[in-house]
């Protein structure tokens, strides 16, 4: 089963996990893997389309707002305005989707004894 989301001239297609990756000069197939190793989605994206559409679709499928995830490729953050061509992505490249974790250690949590 595959679903397609089309917004303007940008197209993002999500394919089932067992589909074979097909090479296309105008599109690239990207795998997005969540923190749990079992969960991954395959997207067929135009090479010149901003990755925001893919990010929104992935997070919508997970039921979480897109800005709560950080998308990484080889440890480098991918922003919503990047395109696969700008990042020189190839068919089958894997993108990691990590939940944003914010923590801090501030002065109010430190107690000194004199």
From Swiss-Prot:
Cross-link (Glycyl lysine isopeptide (Gly-Lys) (interchain with K-? in acceptor proteins)): 104
CDD domains referenced in this protein's UniProt entry, alphabetically: Ubl_SUMO_like
Keyword set, alphabetical order: Cytoplasm, Isopeptide bond, Nucleus, Ubl conjugation pathway
InterPro entries in the cross-refs: Rad60/SUMO-like_dom, Ubiquitin-like_dom, Ubiquitin-like_domsf
Primary location group: nucleus
Subunit (UniProt): Interacts with SAE2, SCE1, SIZ1 and MMS21 Covalently attached to a number of proteins.
Function field: Ubiquitin-like protein which can be covalently attached to target lysines as a monomer. Does not seem to be involved in protein degradation and may function as an antagonist of ubiquitin in the degradation process.
Name of the protein: Putative small ubiquitin-related modifier 4
Encoding gene per record: SUMO4
């Amino acid at each position: 089963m595959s679903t397609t989301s089309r917004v303007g001239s940008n197209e993002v297609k999500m394919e089932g996990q067992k589909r074979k990756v097909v090479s296309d000069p105008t599109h690239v197939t990207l795998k997005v893997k969540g923190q749990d190793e079992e969960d991954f989605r395959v997207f067929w994206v135009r090479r010149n389309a901003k990755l925001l559409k893919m990010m929104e679709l992935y997070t919508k499928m997970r039921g979480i707002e897109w800005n709560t995830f950080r998308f990484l490729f080889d440890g480098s953050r991918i922003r919503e305005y990047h395109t696969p061509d700008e990042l020189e992505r190839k068919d089958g490249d894997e993108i990691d989707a990590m939940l944003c974790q914010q923590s801090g250690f501030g002065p109010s949590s430190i107690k000194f004894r004199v």
